[in-house]
Amino acid sequence: MKNTQRNELAVCGFAAVKKLEKNHPEKIRRLYFTSDVAPKFGGLCKKLAKNHGIYNQKPAKDLEKLCGSVHHQGVVAMIESPAIEPLDFAMAEKWAKNGEHAVLLDRIGNANNFGAIVRSAAFFGIKNIVIPQDESQSSITTSSYRVAEGGMEYVSIYSVSS
C-alpha cells in the first residue's frame, strides 16, 4: 500500500523484508512487526536506532492497515516509493554490449503475477525488467514486492512508452 503523503511503499512479508535488510537497509524508514517475529529483526532494529529510524512492535491488525493485506507475515517496512526510470536507447545499447539480458513485459495487470515474474528473473540472474507506461501494467506495489520475495532487491525496472 502506498502512503502518497509521504511518498512511501509498504514492503511486507518475511522474505521481502529480510532481503531488503540484507541488501538495502538504508532504504527502510520505519519498521513494524508483531511480537512473534520481533526476535528475528533485532539486528535491523539496532541499525535503525543508530540511524534514527523508527521501529515498533504492533498487533497484526495494525500491520494489516499499514500494508492493506492480511499477508504481511508479521512484518512491514516502509520505504520510499521506488522510482521507475524511463529506458533510453543508450541504456539498452549498454546492456547489449555487456551481454546483459532483460525481461520485456507487456501489460501484466496482476500485481501478484508481476511479483512472481520479478522473483523468477532475479533467480535466473536477469537484472533488467522493462514494462510499458500503460495503465493496465502492474507496477511496484506492496503485493508485487511481497510476492517477489526479495527479488525486487536484485532487479532494476524501467519503463517505455507503449
Spell out what each predicted region is:
Residues 1-93:
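N-terminal positively charged helical leader segments and presequences
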Residues 15, 26, 33, 94-162:
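RNA substrate-binding interface of SAM-dependent RNA methyltransferases
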